[in-house]
Amino acid sequence: MHCGPPDMVCETKIVATEDHEALPGAKKDALLAAAGAMWPPLPAAPGPAAAPPPAAGPQPHGGTGGAGPPEGRGVCIREFRAAEQEAARRIFYDGILERIPNTAFRGLRQHPRTQLLYALLAALCFAVTRSLLLTCLVPAGLLALRYYYSRKVILAYLECALHTDMADIEQYYMKPPGSCFWVAVLDGNVVGIVAARAHEEDNTVELLRMSVDSRFRGKGIAKALGRRVLEFAMLHNYSAVVLGTTAVKVAAHKLYESLGFRHMGASDHYVLPGMTLSLAERLFFQVRYHRYRLQLREE
């Protein structure tokens, strides 16, 4: 298994909240006005004196909601700092681990051919054994194998990521021009992350590594992180923002669509870094890779 580092590209890096003054006045005003028109700001959190008592009832989930942070305190989206390396890695690691059961069980619904194959295996078991008990155990065994191989592949992917770009975020995202890494901070704690990397060959920016701590989802943090990448791309004068995801949850796809991304297609033949492509792995692990694009301007 070989895990190569991601290619880095060259472009002047401008961080949205800190480098606006480096632009000429007219251009700065025009770009920020365009950004504000496309992505209106999140509702301002009320001050402590005006905050009403919390209402009883269920809280939203999924990372795309517009509710304010707990107790009305604001979330700050800013550049990554070297001291936050472990916190960022933890959020990334925990977020990817959640995909093990999602890929093993929920993801099966995206692969009708695999479902048919498993049904044929169960039918074959009954034809050979004439035992209803053994036949009923076949689906449970197949799901157990799906979980095992999903865990195996995703842990191998994490091993690759944690030894390439996530091994040294400062080196991979903060030092090279044309890339950046942001964190969402609440009460001094990192609760979300996102990265951007430019591709000079087609004048696009790729959105990467977006993840929010599971305890703070449903508060609009993921959307705020996504907007920061879009503003970064606009200020750099890139033509589009692109991303790829293997997420199974519908909420993740709704988040991208709410930011203005268009679904450009999906592939069932994507090879996740860390895969060995063994026969058993192909039989019990499948992932669908979705591509999204947000066109900012025509070339």
From Swiss-Prot:
What spans are recorded as compositionally biased (Pro residues)?
A: 44-57
Location in the cell: Cytoplasm; Microsome membrane; Mitochondrion membrane; Endoplasmic reticulum membrane
Record field: transmembrane = 118-138
Q: How does it sit in the membrane?
A: Single-pass type I membrane protein; Single-pass membrane protein
User: Please, one GO biological process term?
Assistant: aspartate metabolic process
- Extract the InterPro entries matched here: Acyl_CoA_acyltransferase, GNAT_dom, NAT_camello-type
Single GO MF annotation? L-aspartate N-acetyltransferase activity
GO CC, one annotated term = intracellular membrane-bounded organelle
Please tell me in which tissues this protein is expressed. Expressed in brain, including in mesencephalic dopaminergic neurons of the substantia nigra and ventral tegmental area and oligodendrocytes. Expressed in cortical pyramidal neurons and granule cells of the hippocampus (at protein level).
Q: Which residues form the N-acetyltransferase domain?
A: 143-280
Renumbered to this chain, region (Disordered) spans 44-70
Provide the reaction this enzyme catalyses: L-aspartate + acetyl-CoA = N-acetyl-L-aspartate + CoA + H(+)
EC number from the UniProt entry: 2.3.1.17
- List, as start-end ranges, the regions of compositional bias called Gly residues: 60-70
Main location class: cytoplasm
Q: Which UniProt keywords apply?
A: Acyltransferase, Cytoplasm, Endoplasmic reticulum, Membrane, Microsome, Mitochondrion, Transferase, Transmembrane, Transmembrane helix
Q: What PROSITE patterns does the annotation carry?
A: GNAT
Cited function:
Catalyzes the synthesis of N-acetylaspartate acid (NAA) from L-aspartate and acetyl-CoA. Promotes dopamine uptake by regulating TNF-alpha expression. Attenuates methamphetamine-induced inhibition of dopamine uptake.
Q: Which family does it belong to?
A: Belongs to the NAT8 family.
Name recorded for this polypeptide = N-acetylaspartate synthetase
